[in-house]
Amino acid sequence: MDPNERPSSVSSGRPGSKVYPKTPIGEKFDNIATGRDVEWEPLVDFRRMDVSENTIHGAIAWAHGGEIIHSFGGNVLIYGRSMMKPFMMKVFAEVLDKELNWDQKSIACSSHNGDTEHVAAAQSILNESEWGLMQCPLDVPLVQFGRQVRRPRRWFHTCSGEHAAVLKGMRLLGIRRAGYTLPNSDWFPLYIDVLREYMGDPDWSPDRVAKDGCGMPTTSNTVNELAIMFANLGSRRDEDWIWEAMNRNPDLVGGFNRLDSTCLKAGEGKILAKEGADGLLGLSVIHKDWPRGLGIVIKIAHGWNSQATWYISRAVLGVLGIHLRNPYPLHRQKAFIVPGIVPEMYSEALESIVTWDEWDPDRDRFSLDWKKYTEATTRSDPFSNEGDGGP
């Protein structure tokens, strides 16, 4: 029998088929716009000698307190993923305050590279007898130098610090820890309350609650909702230890050459930055022109692209007077920012935030004019040197 004609054991209507999609084209659900339906906008394009080779689409939202002051790319419905760890930790912030040191508090909010210092900080949160409770996936370090670790461990996973802190917090709150990654665990309604509080919407309910890559629940939110939450994160930064912990130890939040760690260093205490999987970055900025807190959320349409997100972040922070260095240069390309990523009041300032450095010349072009040389050497008749064609 042709394999393509063989009935699948999980075809629609068969036992077990409910856990699979009904169609590879994708189903339509009320009030759930897919990435095909939304109005993504170009945010940055990479050009080789004036010609665009890659154009990175996405969405960006700016919020001042509870007000959206700028939106570009549509109010897309997405998942907050690991970008929401500062909010998740607010569920446990009070009970963990006196229990954790600053390194442990920082790693609790992290999506770390899995370096030695990351693993040590995460492991120190729990007693060794509790390590077996950890349910984050087995993984190898996200970034490795020198000796390569090839045997996966839960502690190497980028979310191990969060999982350890949640387990610690649940014990202190007297919550049963079995099944802690499930949305029916008693801590999850407390997390929903945190999101409602920071959105300023007591009636909010997520359209979807999905399983994140690390196994934890992640809620669907619009880009605008996320920006409002990040704005309020800044205005309420003194209510707990989260802002200070992430700024005290930025390299524990991400690690070497990670965007959120580098943003935290650039902000010198005026920024909280957190990356999320599949092209997310949340920024909470303390700025004199925005007294109710400024929240900026970037979402890359096609998913993870640290370099593109970095150029966008440099631009939006640059117009606010915060210097974020350029990422490491592209290979014989240049990045160019789309003006729509910033409110119109910052358009002029955007012109001065260059996407290259003095040691990063135009290596995407030759220093000679090819026309000058080809006109002198090319024959007008390409067959003139092939003889007279014979008798």
Where are these regions (language model features)?
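Active-site-adjacent helix/loop patches that line small-molecule binding or acyl-intermediate pockets
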Residues: D2, V10-W40, W102-M216, N221, ...
